[in-house]
Amino acid sequence: MSFLNGLFGRKRDSSAELAKQRLLTVLIDDRYKLTPEMMAQMKADLAEVLKRYLPAIDAEQIEVTLSRGEAHDLLKADVPLRRTSEGPSNR
């Protein structure tokens, strides 16, 4: 079966790896004392500020995450933009 998975490129994270990632997330959240409510407020604040410059932001789809990088902990914001027929505005 692993031959078929290798052949078709299907790679799944082990449950141990998932558990490790979840634990790291909990530890990072605890280190910075960020509650789920604070993360939600940060997401809303980011959306509000970014919409001033990019009206095409899809605020409902913004994802804010904390993760551990090689040298630093990382705060990542994935901000999807709706595609529009208009070009960039000149403000």
From Swiss-Prot:
The keyword rRNA-binding does not apply. Belongs to the MinE family. Gene3D superfamilies: Cell division topological specificity factor MinE. Keywords: Cell cycle, Cell division. This is Cell division topological specificity factor. GO terms for biological process: cell division; regulation of division septum assembly. It comes from Chloroflexus aggregans (strain MD-66 / DSM 9485). InterPro entries: MinE (IPR005527), MinE_sf (IPR036707). It comes from the Bacteria. Prevents the cell division inhibition by proteins MinC and MinD at internal division sites while permitting inhibition at polar sites. This ensures cell division at the proper site by restricting the formation of a division septum at the midpoint of the long axis of the cell. The keyword Cytoplasm does not apply.
